[in-house]
Amino acid sequence: MDELYTEDQRMIRDAARAFATEVLAPNAAQWDRDAHLPDAVVAQLGELGLLGMIVPQELGGAYTDYVAYALAMEEIAAGDAACATMMSVHNSVGCGPILGFGTPTQKERWLADMAAGRTIGAFCLTEPQAGSEAHNLRTRAELRDGKWVLNGAKQFVTNGQRAGIAIVFAVTDPDAGKRGISAFLVPTDTPGFVVGKPEKKMGIRASDTCPITFENCAIPEENLLGARGEGLKIALSNLEGGRIGIAAQALGIARAAFDKARRYAGERVQFGKPLAEHQAIQQKLADMATQINAARLLVHHAAKLRTAGLPCLSEASQAKLFASEMAERVCSDAIQIHGGYGYLADYEVERHYRDARITQIYEGTSEVQRMVIARQL
């Protein structure tokens, strides 16, 4: 496979793989128990350039292309899916909106620090009553005396505790429907930006997920991101890259579970021979490997289109849909191959299963992906 990638892509993949193998994988189980990703790990991601993967080098980033991003995301997710969640959200929907719609001043103010990991980004779109129905927002932003004043609540905000800057979507014109939503850059130390208690989750526990409340949170007028009324456009335009990132994350989780299952099947002896010599287990492993490789092809195809600046709404959704559902199947089979031991935390495949499940939900549920794909047919 190496011959299919450029030297830069291989270099980025190998750096991410080394970090995942040496730092993430040995500690992921403990971070899962602690429900906390150490700040030092985030700083190391920044030093490696993994937090500025879509930011051009002239703006302080390490952008090569989206295939390199997908390769790095797969490796980080194989080491620790929770770390990959933080990295994906920060890159795709943290840096992405500023890169695509920010003014030169906004880009200069935020992107270099974000790419270096000095400032982490969050994306505040989902609300308690508005998940897949993203346009049904209740958070309001009113222009008063040269400042935008935000009031409302957001739900399931990844990096909610860690972020220094949040991309916030709020209604600025209640009578304009979908065209009445705008996007804002809100520093998280702004008075009235209130971070709630982190959610207790099934998986990706080391990634902080918090509710956020805006209580007369006032920001300068120039913190409007893009044009007034462009909020939904900004949100949706960055979901393509976000879905490629999550698809690559699902791919990495599946690969980690598969590697453990393959190794265990070679070591565990039943009925006088290793599990891997039993036809039933061989067939499971063959199906798992095939599904993983098929998902990788879909992910990299979407990544190539994104790199070329070509439309990839359907392709990104196909990659995310297939990879996320594949990951749950592969992780389930990995548990089955381990038998009763697979149900124990000591063997870690149960954590991969828990982590995989969210990839069918965030950045658009599987049901939404099918709707998107069907509309493009």
Q: Where is each model-derived feature located?
A:
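Alpha-helical interface subdomain recognition
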Residues: 1-89, 101-106, 113, 117-118, ...
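Short Ser/Thr-interspersed hydrophobic loop/turn segments at strand-loop and sheet-helix junctions
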Residues: 49, 73-77, 170, 186-191, ...
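Short glycine/proline-enriched turns and hinge-like loops at secondary-structure junctions
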Residues: 64, 133-135, 159-164, 177-180, ...
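Short Gly/Pro-enriched turn/cap motifs at secondary-structure boundaries
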Residues: 87, 114, 129-132, 156-159, ...
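Helix-loop "lid/cap" segments that line or gate small-molecule binding pockets
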Residues: 92-100
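A short, Trp-centered hydrophobic/proline-enriched beta-strand micro-motif
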Residues: 117-125
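Flexible, small-/acidic-enriched active-site or ligand-binding loops
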Residues: 136, 189-220
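A short core secondary-structure module
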Residues: 147, 151-195
